[in-house]
UniProtKB/Swiss-Prot annotation:
Pfam families: FtsQ_DivIB_C, POTRA_1. Gene3D superfamilies: membrane protein fhac. It is a single-pass type II membrane protein. It comes from Mycobacterium tuberculosis (strain ATCC 25618 / H37Rv). The gene is ftsQ. This is Cell division protein FtsQ.
Length: 314
């Protein structure tokens, strides 16, 4: 049997391999039990037996050659195909790389498109503004300072700039602005708390713990008066006096009616009942506050804690 439409190169390789394998096959098939005799001494039966053996041997040899040829053809086909396509693994790698690159580009395009849609879509706009922390400051003041147009897409709002604008309100100590998806803007403020008051020609001015003059209003009850020449957040005597005031125990601070600081080294407190506390400098404020809380339980008019190691009562 033969196969048709095969590559001539494969046929040549297969035939050569089959011939090499065929030469290794035994050619003689005569029985070992029967010694070979000269043909002229053979009888009819022996000659017929020999001819049958030769035919069987020839048939077996032909079958072996055909099988070897087919096996060699299969091996040759695989070898030639691999030789003709040596760069196929590399080509597969290139295809995989191109697919990965294409997927990355598609994802990037989708991401950019989604970002642009969110940036411009009215569905995610500031339809509501939530303000938290207002008390003395009104909602209208915050909205006026924020300057956020209704229905502005949330991603177009610079939250830091809005917070900075809100923080310019005198009574606002700090402001924070957050987007609340899908359609709200949240503004959280912390108002300044007055700790001292100072009289000016235009009325009483309120100062917070940082020395910021944030309001011109009547002071809350029991707020101590501030006796400093040039009060302000950068004034050394203002900082020193407020440091002393914030170091006092709450039960002592509530009794202070006035705090005076002609200099950073000569701070004095006047209590609501007229008693005077000589504080001195801001050194060892915590120790002085502890000593003063104990001394005020004793009768006297003047309490000197400028030297906390030797406090005195007069």
């Amino acid at each position: 049997m033969t196969e048709h439409n095969e590559d001539p190169q494969i046929e040549r390789v297969a035939d050569d391999a089959a011939d090499e394998e065929a030469v290794t096959e035994p050619l003689a098939t005569e029985s070992k039990d029967e010694p070979a005799e000269h043909p002229e001494f053979e009888g009819p039966r022996r000659r017929a037996r020999r001819e049958r053996a030769e035919r069987r041997a020839a048939q077996a040899r032909a079958t072996a050659i055909e099988q070897a040829r087919r096996a060699a053809k299969r091996r040759a086909r695989g070898q030639i195909v691999s030789e003709q396509n040596p760069a196929k693994p590399a080509a597969r790698g290139v295809v995989r790389g191109l697919k990965a690159l294409l997927a990355t580009v598609v994802l990037a395009v989708v991401g950019i498109g989604l970002g642009l849609a969110l940036y411009f879509t009215p569905a995610m706009s500031a339809r509501e503004i939530v303000i938290i922390g207002i008390g003395a400051v009104s909602r209208e003041e915050v909205l006026d300072a924020a300057r956020v147009r209704p229905a502005t897409p949330l991603l177009q709002i610079d939250t830091q700039q809005v917070a900075d604008r809100v923080a310019t309100i005198r009574r606002v100590a700090s402001a924070r602005v957050q987007r609340q998806y899908p359609s709200a803007l949240r503004i959280t403020i912390v108002e300044r708390v007055p700790v001292v008051v100072k009289d000016f020609s235009d009325g009483p001015h309120l100062f917070d713990r940082d020395g910021v003059d944030f309001a011109t209003d009547p002071p809350p009850p029991a707020l101590p008066y501030f006796d400093v020449d040039n009060p302000g957040p950068s004034d050394p005597t203002t900082k020193a006096a407020l440091q002393v005031l914030t170091a006092l125990h709450p039960e002592v601070a509530s009794q202070v009616g006035r705090i005076a600081a002609p200099s950073v080294a000569s701070i004095t407190l006047t209590l609501a009942d007229g008693r005077v506390v000589i504080w001195g400098t801001t050194d060892r404020c915590e120790e002085k506050a502890e000593k003063l809380a104990a001394l005020l339980t004793q009768p006297g008019r003047t309490y000197d804690v400028s030297s906390p190691d030797l406090p005195t009562v007069k």
